[in-house]
Amino acid sequence: MDVLTRFNSGKLWDFKGGVHPPERKSQSNQKPIRHAKLVEHFYIPVVQHAGEAGNILVKVGDYVFKGQPLTQGDGLRVLPVHASTSGFIRAIAPYASAHPSGLATLCLHLEADGKDQWREQQPLDDFLTQTPEKLIEKLYQAGVAGLGGAVFPTAAKLHSAEKQVKLLIINGAECEPYITCDDRLMRDYADEIIEGTRILRYILRPEKVVIAVEDNKPEAVAALRQVLQGANDIEIRVIPTKYPSGAAKQLIQILTGMEVPSGQRSSSIGVLMQNVATAFAVKRAIMDDEPLIERVVTLTGDKVRHKGNYWVRLGTPIYQLLQQVDYHYDDRFPVFMGGPMMGFILPDLQAPVTKMTNCLLAPDHFEYAPPAPEQSCIRCSACSDACPVSLMPQQLYWFARSEDHEKSEEYALKDCIECGLCAYVCPSHIPLIQYFRQEKAKIWEIQQKAKQAEEAKQRFEARQARLAREEQERKARAQKAMEARRQEMKTAQGIDPVQAALERLKAKKTDNDSSAKVEIKTIVTEKGDILPDNSDIMAQRKARRLARQQQTQNTDVSQVETNEENKSTDSKSAVAAAIARAKAKKAAQQGSALEKDEISSSDTLSVGNDTEPVAEDPRKAAIAAAIARAKAKKAAQQGSAVEKDEISSSNTLSVGNDTEPVADDPRKVAIAAAIARAKAKKAAQQGSAVEQDEISSSDTLSIGNEAEPVADDPRKAAIAAAIARAKAKKAAQQRSAVEQDEISSSDTLSVGNETESVAEDPRKAAIAAAIARAKAKKAAQQRSAVEQDEISSSDTLSVGNETESVAEDPRKAAIAAAIARAKAKKAAKANNHDA
C-alpha cells in the first residue's frame, strides 16, 4: 500500500514512545503578534542556515536599503542574507553567536538610520504566470529557509524533490512546550499561509496537500478552515497532542503509518514537509518581493513581564529584545533559545536573533531548577522506551563517551532527532542529548575531512588528466606541424627530407662497417690469460719521460755555465780597473823627478813579444784610466767587499816569459800597487773632461795578442792561483808597515829578469793579472783546507814557457778560466773527501 492510499484512508497512526510534558502555551498565545521596536545596531550573521556562507557584497561604510542582499552564494545550498533595515555598514567582524558553543561568528554590523527604507520591490500579482524554476530561484534569492528549526534552504529542498512528491504536508503541530509562534501565525495570518501553501503546491505538483495541526490549537484550525471556505485543494487534519508529534518523521508516521527509511529523506517515499512559518515566508517572498529579514519569536517565561509573540528583525541583539518586554536579568536563571525540550542555554545574551530563533524562554525559580548531578547509568531502559526513533540511547551514550565513532554510526546515531526525550526521562539525570550532539559534531568533522580529501584527490586526478591531455594535444600539434614542414620541403626540393636522412645514415653505417678494424695486440700470460699488449704505449711514455729529463739537465748545465761566465767577466772588469788605476796614478806623477825615473825604468820591463809601447803617450794612460774608472764603478756596485784584495794581489802575478818568480820579493808587489794607485789618482784629476769620450772609445780597444790559452794545463792554473793567494796574503800583512818605503823606492826595483820592457804594453800585463786574480779568488774559496800543501809545492813548478801573447784571443782566455775553475772545484771536493 502506497503513501496516498494510507493517507486517503483517513486513519491516524501512532509512533513509538513520546511523552506529554506540561505545555505552558497559554502564557504567550493570548495576544496577537506584535512588532518589536527597531534597535539602533544590528549584527547580521553571514551564515543563518544549514550550509556555508556566501560571498560578502558590501564593505565598511556602504549604505544599504532594507531588504538589500549583503551576501551572494554560488548554489542553492548557500543562502544570501539581507539588510534588516536601511543604514550603514559599520564593521565586518566576528561577533557572539546564538550557538551552544558560544563561539564568535562573522557578522555584518549594520547601524540603522531610522528611515527603514525598502529597496526597490517588484510584487507579483499572480504566481501562476511564473514557471516553477523561476519561483524556486526567487525563493533562493530571498533567502528563505525552513523556520521549523532545521533552517534547511527551502529552494534546495524543493528543487531536489521536484516531481517526486505525492503528498505535501504543512506542519502546524508545534508540539514543543512554551512555543506558540506557529499557533499565533496560523491565527493571525491564515490567509497568507494558505497562499504560500498553494505556491508550494504549484511548484511541487503533489496529488495531496494537508495542513496538520495538534488538537490543542482549535483557534488556529478554525482560522484556516475559514480561509479555505470549503476548498478541497488543501486538507486540514487535526492530530493528537503528543511530544514529539511535530517532528517530520513522526508526523509522517502519524498521517500515513509509514516510516522514513534510515538514512533517507522523506521524499524517498513521496512525501515532503514544510513548516507553516515557511509557507508564510514563501508567500511574502513570491508575492510581495520581501526577503526573509524577520520572523515571529515567542518571548515567554516568568522572568518576562510582557509575554507574547513578536515580529523581530534578524540581527537584533537578544538582550535588547528582552529589555523591550521588561525582562529582569538574573544570573541564577539562564535564557533558553528554543523550548525546554530541544532548546539550549544561551552563553551570551548579546547574540543576535537568527532564522532559527523561534522562542526565547526566560524562566524563574518556579520553572527552572539547576540540573541535578549526573549519575551512573543504571541500564533501566527508560530512554529506549521513550525514544520515538527506536534507538538505544544508553548504548550510544557509551559509544559517545569512548569516542567510538564507528559504533555510533553502526547504531544509527544520525537518525536521532534530538528531541530530548531520553534526557527528560533519565532517572540518573544524564544529559544524553548533549553527548549525542557532540558525537554528531565529531563524526561530521571527520566526514568533512574525508570529503575534502576526496575532493582534493579528484582535483589532482583531474589536473593530471588535463596535463596528459594537453601534452598529447601538444605532441599532436607538433607532429602535424612537422608533417606540414616535411611536405613543404618535399614539394619545394622534390626529395623527402626524412627519406634522405635515412639514406645518409644507412650510407654512413655502411662506410663504418667497410672500414678496417683496428687490430688489438694481445699477450698470453703464463696462466693462459689473454691480456692487451701495452708495450708500445709504455715505450712511448718512457721515451717522453727521458726526453723531459734530458731537457731539464741541459737547462741546468747551460744555467751554470752562464753564471760562471758572468762571474768571470765581472772579475776581469774589476782586475782591469784596478791595474788601470795603478797605472794612471803612476802616469800622473810623471812631472816630478821620481816620475821620470819610474818612466825610464819602466821601459826596461817586457810583458811578452809585444811591440807597441803603452806609456809613450800620456793621453793613452788617461784614456785607460777613464776606462778603468767606469769599469771600477760598476765593479764597486757588485763586489766592493773584494776590491781591496783584488788590487793588492794584482801586481804579484807573472805576466810574460819571466825566468824567475815575480813574487820572490813581496816588496816589489807592494811597490807596484802603490805606483798604480798614484797613477790612478792623478789620472782621475786630469781625465774628468774627456771621460765621456774615453768611455765611448773603450769598446774599440784590443785586449792583446795572447798566443795560447793560459789553461793549456789546468794544474798550472791552479798552482798559479795558489801562489798568487799566498803572496797576496803575505803582502797584505806587510803593506801597512812598508807602504811609504815601497813608494819611495819604487823607481829602483825591477820586477824580474825580463827580456822585454813591461811598459811596452801595460794593458797586456793588466789582462794577465786579472785572469790570475779571478783564478786565485775561486781557488781560495774552494781549497782553504789544502792551502799550505799547494804553497809548499808551488816553488818546484814552472808557470810556463809561453812564447806567444796571452791576449791574442780573449775568448779563449775566458774559456780556459772557466775550465780551470771547474777543475779546481772538482779537485777541492776530492781533497776534502780524502781529508
Swiss-Prot record:
<dbReference type="GO" id="GO:0046872">
    <property type="term" value="F:metal ion binding"/>
</dbReference>
<feature type="compositionally biased region" description="Polar residues">
    <location>
        <begin position="552"/>
        <end position="561"/>
    </location>
</feature>
<feature type="compositionally biased region" description="Basic and acidic residues">
    <location>
        <begin position="468"/>
        <end position="489"/>
    </location>
</feature>
<feature type="region of interest" description="Disordered">
    <location>
        <begin position="682"/>
        <end position="714"/>
    </location>
</feature>
<feature type="compositionally biased region" description="Polar residues">
    <location>
        <begin position="745"/>
        <end position="756"/>
    </location>
</feature>
<keyword id="KW-0479">Metal-binding</keyword>
<keyword id="KW-0004">4Fe-4S</keyword>
<feature type="binding site">
    <location>
        <position position="380"/>
    </location>
    <ligand>
        <name>[4Fe-4S] cluster 1</name>
    </ligand>
</feature>
<keyword id="KW-0677">Repeat</keyword>
<dbReference type="GO" id="GO:0022900">
    <property type="term" value="P:electron transport chain"/>
</dbReference>
<dbReference type="InterPro" id="IPR017900">
    <property type="entry name" value="4Fe4S_Fe_S_CS"/>
</dbReference>
<dbReference type="InterPro" id="IPR017896">
    <property type="entry name" value="4Fe4S_Fe-S-bd"/>
</dbReference>
<dbReference type="GO" id="GO:0005886">
    <property type="term" value="C:plasma membrane"/>
</dbReference>
<keyword id="KW-0997">Cell inner membrane</keyword>
<feature type="binding site">
    <location>
        <position position="387"/>
    </location>
    <ligand>
        <name>[4Fe-4S] cluster 2</name>
    </ligand>
</feature>
<keyword id="KW-0813">Transport</keyword>
<feature type="domain" description="4Fe-4S ferredoxin-type 1">
    <location>
        <begin position="368"/>
        <end position="397"/>
    </location>
</feature>
<feature type="compositionally biased region" description="Polar residues">
    <location>
        <begin position="793"/>
        <end position="804"/>
    </location>
</feature>
<dbReference type="GO" id="GO:0051539">
    <property type="term" value="F:4 iron, 4 sulfur cluster binding"/>
</dbReference>
<dbReference type="InterPro" id="IPR037225">
    <property type="entry name" value="Nuo51_FMN-bd_sf"/>
</dbReference>
<protein>
    <recommendedName>
        <fullName>Ion-translocating oxidoreductase complex subunit C</fullName>
        <ecNumber>7.-.-.-</ecNumber>
    </recommendedName>
</protein>
<keyword id="KW-0408">Iron</keyword>
<feature type="binding site">
    <location>
        <position position="416"/>
    </location>
    <ligand>
        <name>[4Fe-4S] cluster 2</name>
    </ligand>
</feature>
<feature type="binding site">
    <location>
        <position position="422"/>
    </location>
    <ligand>
        <name>[4Fe-4S] cluster 2</name>
    </ligand>
</feature>
<keyword id="KW-1003">Cell membrane</keyword>
<comment type="function">
    <text>Part of a membrane-bound complex that couples electron transfer with translocation of ions across the membrane.</text>
</comment>
<keyword id="KW-0411">Iron-sulfur</keyword>
<dbReference type="GO" id="GO:0009055">
    <property type="term" value="F:electron transfer activity"/>
</dbReference>
<feature type="binding site">
    <location>
        <position position="377"/>
    </location>
    <ligand>
        <name>[4Fe-4S] cluster 1</name>
    </ligand>
</feature>
<dbReference type="Pfam" id="PF13375">
    <property type="entry name" value="RnfC_N"/>
</dbReference>
<dbReference type="Pfam" id="PF01512">
    <property type="entry name" value="Complex1_51K"/>
</dbReference>
<feature type="region of interest" description="Disordered">
    <location>
        <begin position="468"/>
        <end position="492"/>
    </location>
</feature>
<comment type="similarity">
    <text>Belongs to the 4Fe4S bacterial-type ferredoxin family. RnfC subfamily.</text>
</comment>
<keyword id="KW-0472">Membrane</keyword>
<feature type="region of interest" description="Disordered">
    <location>
        <begin position="778"/>
        <end position="811"/>
    </location>
</feature>
<dbReference type="Pfam" id="PF12838">
    <property type="entry name" value="Fer4_7"/>
</dbReference>
<feature type="compositionally biased region" description="Polar residues">
    <location>
        <begin position="648"/>
        <end position="657"/>
    </location>
</feature>
<feature type="binding site">
    <location>
        <position position="419"/>
    </location>
    <ligand>
        <name>[4Fe-4S] cluster 2</name>
    </ligand>
</feature>
<dbReference type="InterPro" id="IPR011538">
    <property type="entry name" value="Nuo51_FMN-bd"/>
</dbReference>
<feature type="binding site">
    <location>
        <position position="383"/>
    </location>
    <ligand>
        <name>[4Fe-4S] cluster 1</name>
    </ligand>
</feature>
<keyword id="KW-0249">Electron transport</keyword>
<feature type="region of interest" description="Disordered">
    <location>
        <begin position="540"/>
        <end position="574"/>
    </location>
</feature>
